[in-house]
């Protein structure tokens, strides 16, 4: 994609970006009406050429007066870049970001660039506003466009506002935000807002935050984009990805009060070494969800029916985890449990505390199956497989009832068919089934009894199986009923 600029006559000083409704001449008060205070008075039509060769006008903006811009920036005056097209960033200085980190803060009256277009068409360029203290207003980039640019906003203090990128567009750019302090405003608490942005082939990073802020990606639409959020050493107040679309979102080393990710379309969402403090709701079309090595002291509500991967490896839960549809979460959870069965044990204890006993049994069953797969002693492994088969490791009592009936029928048929086994008073198959039943349950009416030693030994074996099997069945059944 290429950007072309053509100077035009514009006596009415009407400017717009993306569509003609986003203009300084609108009457609804939604878009900024004030134009730049560092403009040159020269207007330009901005065209975009796509890969197919189609050329479309995307904006009509003013070109800046770079000498005036340098003067204002150096003196810390208020800079308004509304409806400005910028493709030269020398006015920011030639220092690299790491070279200005040790410099003292520069006090600035204000800085905004709403409905602006910042395009780098040459060597890699940095748009870095660093080591600055803004006295009034938001640092606002709403509706602006960033093309082929490295945007660095670090060591900033926005004393009476927030950092805002609402409705901005990013293309082949890197955004790095760190050490930001926002004072908020009467309408919003301190936050960094990327609401309704559009991004293609972009990387967004936050790191080394100096204040507990909220991050808002409401309805953000991105492709080929990676979002990495790390607030260390501070916390995030709230993280919002409601109705957002993203490829990869990774949140690390964060203490988070509230997480709101509803109706989102995210290929891979990962929380690593995070601590959840109050409430977290995660739902939508999320292909991979990783919550690893985290501490949950909050209430989670998870609704990820289409997740192909779901891991809770190394996570400690002291809060509550609620699944809207746990059945759909079983396949990805059990696939991940082969490497860390303890996550199923953690969920089992969670469901026991919340009274979701069916889900508790499911977790117990798959946890025990994972342990069986890891068992190296063949004899123990065979015993565990048998326990799974007859009762699902204690979670399926009616399977045990079928086993009891099958054993009675098996011994009755053996008594009937084996010539060396005989009972007094039994001649037909049903009578031998009856003999097997009273032996199994140790009833002992006295109407039937074994006639030889071999029959007595076999009956003794069946009686032992009957006592143990019946006791086991009653324990499993009472556990189900009492709960």
For each of these PLM feature ranges, what is it?
Residues 360, 414, 477:
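Hydrophobic, well-ordered secondary-structure elements that form the walls
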Residues 380-449:
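Core alpha-helical transmembrane segments of integral membrane proteins
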Residues 423-483:
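Pore domain of cation channels
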Residues 2-381:
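N-terminal leader/targeting and pre-domain segments
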Residues 366, 413, 417, 464-467, ...:
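Generic, well-ordered alpha-helical scaffold segments in large soluble proteins
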Residues 355, 371, 409, 418-421, ...:
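Alpha-helix capping/termination and helix-coil
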Residues 336, 349-352, 399, 403, ...:
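Generic alpha-helical structural element
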């Amino acid at each position: 994609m290429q950007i072309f600029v053509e100077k035009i006559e514009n006596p009415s000083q009407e400017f717009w970006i993306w569509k003609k409704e986003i203009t300084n001449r609108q009457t609804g008060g939604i878009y900024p009406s004030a134009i730049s205070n560092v403009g040159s008075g020269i207007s330009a039509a901005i065209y975009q050429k796509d890969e197919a060769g189609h050329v479309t006008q995307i904006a009509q903006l003013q070109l800046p007066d770079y000498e005036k811009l340098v003067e204002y920036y150096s003196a810390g005056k208020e800079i308004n870049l509304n409806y400005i097209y910028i493709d030269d960033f020398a006015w920011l200085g030639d220092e690299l970001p790491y070279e200005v980190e040790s410099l003292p803060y520069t006090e600035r009256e204000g800085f905004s660039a709403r409905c602006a277009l910042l395009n780098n068409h040459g060597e890699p360029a940095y748009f870095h506003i660093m080591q600055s203290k803004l006295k009034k207003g938001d640092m606002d980039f709403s509706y602006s466009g960033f093309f082929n640019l490295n945007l660095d906003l670090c060591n900033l203090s926005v004393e009476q506002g927030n950092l805002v990128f609402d409705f901005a567009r990013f293309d082949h750019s890197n955004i790095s935000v760190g050490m930001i302090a926002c004072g908020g405003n009467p309408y919003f608490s301190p936050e960094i807002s990327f609401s309704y942005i559009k991004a293609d082939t972009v990387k967004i990073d936050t790191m080394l935050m100096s204040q507990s802020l909220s991050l808002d990606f409401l309805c953000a639409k991105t492709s080929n984009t990676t979002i990495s959020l790390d607030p260390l050493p501070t916390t995030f107040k709230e993280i919002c990805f409601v109705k957002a679309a993203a490829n990869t979102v990774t949140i690390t080393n964060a203490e988070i009060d509230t997480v709101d990710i509803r109706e989102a379309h995210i290929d891979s969402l990962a929380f690593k070494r995070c601590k959840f403090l109050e409430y977290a709701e995660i739902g939508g079309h999320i292909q991979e969800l990783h919550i690893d090595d985290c501490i949950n002291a909050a209430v989670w509500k998870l609704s990820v029916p289409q997740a192909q991967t779901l891991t809770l490896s190394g996570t400690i839960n002291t809060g509550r985890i609620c699944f809207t549809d746990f059945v759909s979460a079983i396949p990805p959870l059990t696939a991940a449990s082969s490497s860390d069965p303890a996550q199923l044990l953690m969920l089992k204890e969670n469901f026991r505390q919340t009274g979701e006993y069916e889900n508790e049994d499911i977790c117990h069953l798959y946890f025990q199956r994972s342990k069986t797969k890891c068992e190296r002693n063949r004899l123990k492994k065979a015993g565990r497989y048998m326990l799974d088969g007859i009762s699902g490791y204690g979670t399926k009592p009616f399977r045990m009832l079928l086993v009891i009936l099958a054993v009675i029928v098996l011994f009755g048929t053996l008594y009937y068919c084996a010539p060396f086994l005989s009972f007094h008073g039994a001649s037909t198959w049903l009578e031998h089934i009856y003999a097997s039943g009273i032996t199994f349950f140790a009833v002992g009416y006295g109407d039937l009894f074994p006639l030889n030693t071999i029959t007595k030994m076999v009956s003794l074996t069946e009686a032992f199986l009957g006592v143990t099997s019946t006791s086991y069945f009653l324990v499993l059944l009472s556990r189900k009923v009492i709960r």
